[in-house]
From Swiss-Prot:
The lineage of its organism: Bacteria, Bacillati, Actinomycetota, Actinomycetes, Mycobacteriales. SUPFAM superfamilies: Bet v1-like. This is Uncharacterized protein Rv1546. It comes from Mycobacterium tuberculosis (strain ATCC 25618 / H37Rv). Pfam families: Polyketide_cyc2. It comes from the Bacteria. One of its GO terms (cellular component) is plasma membrane. InterPro entries: Polyketide_cyclase/dehydratase, START-like_dom_sf. CDD domains: SRPBCC.
Length: 143
């Protein structure tokens, strides 16, 4: 599985950062791989909640069934996803306080049969670019 984990400092409080991170309707505004939801968003999130969305990775769109695997407000939310063709996704968002506001951590994982061999290293590079761009967009949008 190709995975990258990076963080960025944002000049807003940890609670404000969490409020944006946990607002699923805002996810497409800053998370590069997220194109939109195809199911109703739940009124309340928690472990085990499932949501259907569309993800874009390496230029390919895929319908993904996401499941919340960790829900620890206001610190961490993690989701795993399964898409068509055996693709696997993982997204973990963390928020921690810093002296100047908060740090947003983003771990993005991409895997499945299609990503073995040379395509796997290309996927790792693409995932790193997506994580960097997502963190930058979050900071620009909300910071």
């Amino acid at each position: 599985m190709a995975s990258v984990e990076l963080s960025a400092d944002v000049p807003i409080s940890p609670q404000d950062t969490w409020d944006h991170v946990s607002e699923l309707s805002e996810l497409g505004e800053w998370l590069v791989i997220h194109e939109g939801w195809r199911s109703e968003l739940p009124d309340q999130l928690g472990e085990g909640v499932q949501i259907v969305g569309v993800a874009r990775a390496m230029g390919m769109r895929n319908r993904v069934t996401w499941r919340v695997t960790k829900w620890d407000p206001p610190h961490e939310v993690a989701m795993t996803g399964s898409g068509k063709g055996g693709t696997k996704y993982g997204v973990t968002l963390t928020v921690r306080p810093t002296k100047g506001g908060s740090a947003l951590g983003l771990r993005l994982e991409l895997g499945g049969r299609a990503l073995f061999g040379p395509l796997g290293s290309a996927a790792a590079r693409a995932v790193k670019g997506d994580v960097e761009k997502s963190l930058k967009q979050f900071a620009e949008l909300y910071g």
